[in-house]
Structures are given as C-alpha cells and as structure tokens.
C-alpha cells in the first residue's frame, strides 16, 4: 500500500509532482530508490543527492592541531536549538572534538568510554550524562572522523553556527601561508556544494552503470536515434563528473575557475604542486528524522 508519507518523502527527494510520485511508487511496489530512478528516466526529477532529511539539533565542531597536520570533526546531537546554543554544551562539544583528534578508538562506542579531557575524572560518556541531567535534554556523540597529513596542511570551515563542518587536507612538499588560504576556499566549496566525490577515481562502476542506464532511457524517451544515444550518454557522464567530483566543479567564488584550475594557479604561486588529498563534510542531523509534532493533535490530547 502506498501511503501519503511515502509520497511526501519521494516529493522531498525529487521535487516531482504528487501524482507522478504516487504513480512511480505504485510502479515500483513502494521502493523509494527505484521510484527515484523511474522519475528520472521520465525526466520528472533531477539527479537526487539523497543525504536524508535533516532534523536533529546539535553541533558540528572541528579541531585542528597547532601544526595543522592532524585534525578531527565531530557531531554531537541534542534535542533543541536552545541547548545547542548553550555555552556548556558548546564547551563539551569543543573538548570532544579536541579529544577526537588524538583518539585511537575506531568507533563512537569505544571513544565515549575514554577518560574525558575536560575533567579530572570520568569518561566522555559520564560528561555527556552529567550535562543531560543538568540541562534536562537527551544528548549523544553521533560520529567523529580524523585526518592527518605529513607534507601539507589541514584546514576547517564551520558554517551556520555548527550546522555544517568541513575538513580539507592538502598535500604539498613546500610550506606556505598560501596553503591555508587554498584549503579554506576548498572547504567553503565543500560546505556549499556537498560534492559526493573527490575526483573521478572515487566514482564506482555501479554508480556509473546506473547513471548510464538512466541517461540512455532518457535519451530514447526524447526520441533520439539509437545510433547517437551512446555518444549522448557519455556526454552526460562527463557532465555528471563535473557536477559531482569536487576538483572538477565550478568554483563558487569565481565561475571562471574549476577547483582544479584554481589549485593549479595557487601551485604556481607557491612554487610546488598542491593536491587536494581528502575532505570530510558533516551536516548536523544528516539522515536523522525527527518526530514531527502535530499541534492540533497535541491540543486535543490536553483537552481530553
């Protein structure tokens, strides 16, 4: 059975009309992912970046070591933006980010059992529990990631008071203040555009095969002759690379440049090759669906 919630979710992902979404879900027996493909094949939806609904509160924070060779990024969730703005909560998150840069833990469960650097006794888990008791709101350390580099630097960018956090790792044999400028510019690009891949080598064959099939069906539906469809498909794959690979994207600060071209220009300035080696992007509440409150229903319950 196709529910209104399923139709709503598909509309949010694709931007397609309600009836088109319902038909696509019916055609695919309620499989949202396949329904997205059906809508794209019919030209009714743009290529979807399914990052999931963003609903949870909290903060994304980064920590960069003084030598800029090691860094971390963390997400700590809470229930309301009121607590997210609380100075004690911010302090907790900042300490957790700093501790994450040096941890040997491989997952969150192990990490939160470590002795907390913000107090003389107790673990990270204990510190979180204590603040939960004090502020009366549930909190959790959701995820963390580390980056390190030998020759080069790592820089960060935080957008929207902790809504989005980015780490960017640059490799370069020469030290220069220009590297920080480049890394911050690239980090802002990642925050703004949310590229799925660093470069073409990160795009797996399964993804490319799926895209090719969608483009092929689109071309045939447009009435294009079979003999030119393959050429059209490959042209659209090249466009896919340019839209989804960070180094091939048009730079948001100057559309005359791609990120790759901008980095090469700066390499000349430094006198050594600069390479964008890695990036990490966390968005607060990414993929977490928050319970939607029905105000009218809540009033009814209170009146009963």
UniProtKB/Swiss-Prot annotation:
InterPro entries: EF-Ts_dimer_sf, Transl_elong_EFTs/EF1B, Transl_elong_EFTs/EF1B_dimer, Transl_elong_Ts_CS, UBA-like_sf. It is found in: Cytoplasm. Transmembrane segments: none annotated. SUPFAM superfamilies: Elongation factor Ts (EF-Ts), dimerisation domain, UBA-like. Pfam families: EF_TS. Keywords: Cytoplasm, Elongation factor, Protein biosynthesis. Residues 80-83 are annotated as: Involved in Mg(2+) ion dislocation from EF-Tu. It comes from the Bacteria. PROSITE patterns: EF_TS_1 (PS01126), EF_TS_2 (PS01127). HAMAP family: EF_Ts. PANTHER family: ELONGATION FACTOR TS (PTHR11741), ELONGATION FACTOR TS, MITOCHONDRIAL (PTHR11741:SF0). Belongs to the EF-Ts family. This is Elongation factor Ts. It comes from Clostridium tetani (strain Massachusetts / E88).
């Amino acid at each position: 059975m196709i529910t209104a919630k399923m139709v709503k979710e598909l509309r949010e992902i694709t931007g397609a009309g309600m009836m088109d979404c319902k038909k696509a879900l019916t055609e695919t027996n309620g499989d949202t992912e396949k329904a997205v493909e059906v809508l794209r094949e019919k030209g009714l939806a743009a290529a979807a970046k399914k990052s999931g609904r963003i609903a949870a509160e909290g903060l994304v924070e980064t920590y960069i070591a003084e030598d800029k060779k090691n860094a971390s990024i963390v997400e700590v969730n809470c229930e309301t933006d009121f607590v997210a703005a609380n100075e004690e909560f911010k302090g907790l998150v900042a300490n957790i980010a700093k501790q994450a840069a040096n941890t040997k833990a491989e997952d969150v469960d192990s990490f939160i059992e470590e002795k907390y650097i913000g107090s003389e006794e107790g673990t990270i888990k204990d510190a979180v529990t204590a603040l939960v008791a004090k502020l009366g709101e549930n909190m959790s350390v959701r995820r963390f990631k580390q980056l390190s580099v030998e020759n080069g630097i790592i820089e960060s960018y935080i957008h929207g008071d902790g809504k989005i956090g980015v780490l960017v790792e640059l490799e370069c044999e020469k030290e220069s203040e220009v590297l920080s400028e480049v890394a911050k510019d690239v980090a802002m690009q990642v925050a703004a555009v949310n590229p799925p891949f660093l470069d073409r080598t990160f795009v797996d064959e399964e993804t490319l095969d799926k895209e090719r099939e969608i483009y092929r069906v689109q071309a045939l539906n447009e009435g294009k002759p079979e003999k030119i469809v393959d050429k059209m498909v490959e042209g659209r794959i090249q466009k896919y690379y340019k839209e989804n690979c960070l180094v091939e994207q048009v730079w948001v600060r100057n559309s005359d440049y791609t990120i790759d071209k901008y980095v090469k220009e700066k390499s000349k300035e430094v006198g050594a090759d600069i390479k964008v080696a890695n990036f990490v992007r966390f968005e607060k509440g990414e993929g977490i669906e928050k319970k939607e409150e029905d105000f009218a229903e809540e009033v009814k319950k209170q009146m009963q």
